[in-house]
């Protein structure tokens, strides 16, 4: 983060960003996705799922279009889906209704003091959430327990190799949503149109994030037809 901007804060200057300003003005629900890998694909999949369910969706952040200019057209019932980088999240105040952290690897360290600084920058995506909000974490990622320890919101997980009590899981080649330990089948993993095990993980994250917004049949239909 720019040292000159940081130095301005103690002198009473208001330091903000386009995205932070958008959060303060946005009238509708917000899904925010961050992580080292898969965030663009996961953000796009979440957007496609919500659109297929009938929501009016605005895609932005690192992808899509600048959203401040379309704020006047946004309605309360719309949904915004954002891809956010660690650089955007550093020192940023935000409270998305649903936050997703896909995974964490030592990326973009040129923009951070060290790996711990990078890890902690991602916490900004959910630290101001409340009990009714949702944080979605990768159960297979070593940093998820650390993130969960700071969460005040509900925490759901996704995994392609271990059982989850709430979230989404792939077991024996079948993808399920899970609520309170009860599984609801969505589809076989080999039915996902975008190839690769990493894209199954991206869909698991998206299915966990959109539970309560998008039904299982719509999830299956999108995953079988969306080409990326």
List the model feature ranges, each with a label:
Residues 112-116, 153-228:
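Adenine nucleotide phosphate-binding catalytic loops in nucleotide-utilizing enzymes
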Residues 1-139, 143-154:
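Phosphate-binding loop of NTP-binding sites
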């Amino acid at each position: 983060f720019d040292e000159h901007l940081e130095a301005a804060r103690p002198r009473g200057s208001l330091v903000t960003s386009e995205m932070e300003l958008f959060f303060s003005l946005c009238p509708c629900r917000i899904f925010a996705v961050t992580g080292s890998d898969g965030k663009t694909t996961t953000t796009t999949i979440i957007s496609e799922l919500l659109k297929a369910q009938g929501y009016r969706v605005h895609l932005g952040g690192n992808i899509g279009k600048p959203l401040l200019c379309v704020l006047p057209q946004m309605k309360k019932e719309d949904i915004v889906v954002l891809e956010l980088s660690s650089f955007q999240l550093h020192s940023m105040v935000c409270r998305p209704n649903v936050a997703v952290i896909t995974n964490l690897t030592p990326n973009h360290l040129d923009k951070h003091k060290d790996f711990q600084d990078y890890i902690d920058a991602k916490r900004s995506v959910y630290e101001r959430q409340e009990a009714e909000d949702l944080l979605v974490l990768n159960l297979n990622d070593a940093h998820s327990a650390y993130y969960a320890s700071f969460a005040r919101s509900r925490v759901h997980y996704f995994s392609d190799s271990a059982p989850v009590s709430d979230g989404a899981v792939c077991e024996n080649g079948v993808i399920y949503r899970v609520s309170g330990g009860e599984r609801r089948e969505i589809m076989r993993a080999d039915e996902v149109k975008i190839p690769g095990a990493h894209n199954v993980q991206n869909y698991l994250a998206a299915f966990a994030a959109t539970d309560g917004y998008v039904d299982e049949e719509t999830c299956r239909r999108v995953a079988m037809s969306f080409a990326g």
